Amino acid sequence: MEPQRRGRTLHARSYVHRQMYHTEDILYHNETYEKALRALEMGRAARENCDIVTGERAPQIVQLAGDDPEQFVQAARRFLPIADAIDLNLGCPQARARDGHYGGYLLKRREWPLLERIVQALCKSCDVPITTKIRLCDTASDTYELGQRLALAGSSVITLHARHVAPNRRRAGMAKLEHVRGLVDALGAERRTRVLSNGNVRSWADIPTNMAYTHADGVMVGEPLLVNPDLFAPSAACSHHQHYPAQCALSDSQCQWSGSPIVTYLSMCERYPIDAPMSCIQQHIQSMMRGLPPSRETRALHDALRDAGDVQTMLHLARSSSVLQLQAGAVHKDDPK
């Protein structure tokens, strides 16, 4: 999941597991660090983040942004007991990243020595993998060369969002996936650094197409996951509960309509009460509502959820909604046995 500095709750990240923080926020605003640590600890302990068949726990990656190598090291060290990897954000296109000199505004060639020093310092100081996320540089050759230099500096994974940095049109047009393939080729067949492709994935069917074209080792998805958090698990309407009911963390009533991501998300909000503002929860719900077919019933549900004042009321509305029951029923119908 593509991270954001603001607007992600633990419950949204429980489908995927990455969050971005500015190094200065972690070092100089203890409340921010303590909140981040609580969310990571809760995420690590959450039963939903553990595969009941293999016992494997989903990894949690902390993404940091900034422009000072020493601050990166200090901030990363604070997360080492709980993070499975540290990611360097070199892709944020927003105006605050430009004003703060971080994210995608460090991609100019003059900044490359600084980026190498940051990655090298993190690799030297941390005993977890160090990864990087970038966007396209001014030219294709610059993108490939920067990828090579980050790999040599120690980046275990490079995620390329195949669009240029633009604060006002940051997702305009299709991503230029040919440059992901170019980066893979530039790193070579014997590369140790893995490449993730970011862009042009809006459904499960897009994933194998993307990987076949780019030759990437995996994909990262951003905003489409806000609409459909189950994008990476098609037709998996609580398959764990269906096949392993004794081990499932959810009760029968909780799983009844678990094919709806809205019900799943609100159930997790209820089960893991952290200090996420209602405005943030509402924002996630409204994003998921965009995935429902338009109708009077959908509009009525949209308005009712928007006007609800607490998670319990929203969850009751969602569980009793015929619109979401139909959505879940369609998922269960398609679920392979």
Go through each PLM region and give its residues.
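Short secondary-structure transition/capping segments
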Residues: 7-12, 98-101, 170-173, 208-210, ...
